[in-house]
Amino acid sequence: MGKLDKKQLIESLKEMTIVEIDEIIKAVEEAFGVTATPIVAAGAAGATQEAASEVSVKVTGYADNAKLAVLKLYREITGVGLMEAKTAVEKLPCVVKQDIKPEEAEELKKRFVEVGATVEVK
């Protein structure tokens, strides 16, 4: 038997019943040691991975004696003025940075926790 190209293979499959195609799929899985998985499952896994690649950091609270330190750190990271930083820190929760890599988010969280803030990474 000669080698089939894609077009010939598809034409052959069009002439088969669903049962025959299912038998071919099982034979291919067995011959190559693979499993046919739905495309939807692969797409969903990719979407989950993509969603986790960008996160946001929010300050959700701070200790009574940590307000000034949180305010200074917020200004340092965001580059906003004193009044903007004060307003943001007093109206919690406030987003510090968004759409950043998880590694950067964890570093920011660590810095805020060190000065007495409660932080959420999503």
Swiss-Prot record:
Which Pfam families did the record assign?
Ribosomal_L12, Ribosomal_L12_N
| A biological process term (GO) from this entry | translation
**Ribonucleoprotein as UniProt keyword:** yes
For molecular function, the Gene Ontology terms on record are: mRNA binding; structural constituent of ribosome
Question: What is one cellular component GO term in this UniProt entry?
Answer: cytosolic large ribosomal subunit
Q: List the disulfide bonds.
A: none
* InterPro entries from the UniProt entry: Ribosomal_bL12, Ribosomal_bL12_C, Ribosomal_bL12_C/ClpS-like, Ribosomal_bL12_oligo, Ribosomal_bL12_oligo_N_sf
Which Gene3D superfamilies does UniProt cross-reference here? Answer: 3.30.1390.10, Single helix bin (1.20.5.710)
Entry's family note: Belongs to the bacterial ribosomal protein bL12 family.
Its function? Forms part of the ribosomal stalk which helps the ribosome interact with GTP-bound translation factors. Is thus essential for accurate translation.
What is its quaternary makeup? Homodimer. Part of the ribosomal stalk of the 50S ribosomal subunit. Forms a multimeric L10(L12)X complex, where L10 forms an elongated spine to which 2 to 4 L12 dimers bind in a sequential fashion. Binds GTP-bound translation factors.
According to UniProt, the name of this protein is Large ribosomal subunit protein bL12
Q: Which organism is it from?
A: Mycoplasma genitalium (strain ATCC 33530 / DSM 19775 / NCTC 10195 / G37) (Mycoplasmoides genitalium)
Output the lineage of the source organism.
Bacteria, Bacillati, Mycoplasmatota, Mycoplasmoidales, Mycoplasmoidaceae
